[in-house]
Amino acid sequence: MAKKVIKVVKLQIPAGKANPAPPVGPALGQAGVNIMAFCKEFNARTADQAGLIIPVEITVFEDRSFTFITKTPPAAVLLKKAAGIESGSGEPNRNKVATIKRDKVREIAELKMPDLNAASIEAAMRMIEGTARSMGIVIED
């Protein structure tokens, strides 16, 4: 028989830098998970993606065991990295902070494809372009 799920915890943690301090510790401590075991496993799985924020979905079972799924980094984080900027524009309709090429947008869309509910790469690109627009990033061909 399948184990009974008691909690699903969603967090965004920097790759390779999970530690028992907040926000990881309290979120998993409440569910009774072995926090150090999670941190070691997460850091090992995400060591190759240093510098990115990785969304993770932790499923906690009745016997306090857990499994977790790492997702692709948020589009905004990937766009900031591609554009080489620290943060998006506070007023994206007035102040443009950076410009990126359409082929960079395609790369990001291809990377994000498993987590987006888009049927084609073009639809995924439009989603990423919308995120870029709302951050004050201009896309050129």
UniProtKB/Swiss-Prot annotation:
Single GO term (MF): large ribosomal subunit rRNA binding
Gene Ontology CC annotations of this record: cytosolic large ribosomal subunit
Listed PROSITE patterns: RIBOSOMAL_L11 (PS00359)
Post-translational modification: One or more lysine residues are methylated.
CDD domains found in the cross-reference section: Ribosomal_L11 (cd00349)
GO process annotations (BP): translation
Any Pfam family matching the protein: Ribosomal_L11
Entry-linked PANTHER family: 60S RIBOSOMAL PROTEIN L12, LARGE RIBOSOMAL SUBUNIT PROTEIN UL11M
Description of how the protein assembles with itself and partners: Part of the ribosomal stalk of the 50S ribosomal subunit. Interacts with L10 and the large rRNA to form the base of the stalk. L10 forms an elongated spine to which L12 dimers bind in a sequential fashion forming a multimeric L10(L12)X complex.
Function according to Swiss-Prot or TrEMBL: Forms part of the ribosomal stalk which helps the ribosome interact with GTP-bound translation factors.
Protein known as: Large ribosomal subunit protein uL11
